[in-house]
Amino acid sequence: TPMSLLSSAGESGAGSGVKNIVFFDNVRVPAKNLIGGENNGWQVATTHLELEHGTGGRIARNWIVDRIFDHCKETRFDGQPISSERFTQDKLIDIYIDAEIGRLFQLRNYWMRHTGASFTYEGPQASYFRKTSGLRIATNILEILGPHALTNDEEIAVEEGHIEAHQRAAIIALHPGGTTDIQ
């Protein structure tokens, strides 16, 4: 069954464009092909969900945050960097706080995963925060840059169109499958 999905033309993981879903009814899997053993399917499924929903963790910084900070320092308006405006500074602070809180959640989860610690709420917490803070970050970037954040036009695009792609991706990342609140 083809599904035409909203695309940011560069989603990681799922890819972009048309998706196909295949349904099987009354299928029996031979015991030798079971993943995780008999009656252990739920454990296999939840392990996948744990990894998908943030328990893998990560240590990388948010590259879009670094780019927007550099852009605001380097771009001048009336002879001054736009980062010197109080409004822009307030928005940049909000962006930085959201990015670093999310990074701390991911660092914690990375540490837990690699030390063999047990997870309870940590993965869904990081996933939910990543999704909601991503939209807040995109909104703050839009408020700083205005319409320049929404175009990939060569003459006026910010960061070679990466900001425009980030704006589209932030909406999709809020709920790439299901709803934001279901973790």
Where in this protein do the model-derived segments appear?
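FAD-binding core of flavoproteins
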Residues: 1-77
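C-terminal helix-coil-helix/basic helical segment that borders enzyme active sites and/or dimer interfaces
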Residues: 73, 77-86, 100-157
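Hydrophobic packing residues in well-ordered alpha-helices of helical domains and bundles
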Residues: 61, 85, 92, 123-126, ...
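Tryptophan-centric aromatic hotspots in well-structured domains and transmembrane helices
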Residues: 22-23, 42-44, 71, 97, ...
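Glycine-rich phosphate/cofactor-binding loops in nucleotide/flavin-utilizing enzymes
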Residues: 39-58, 145-183
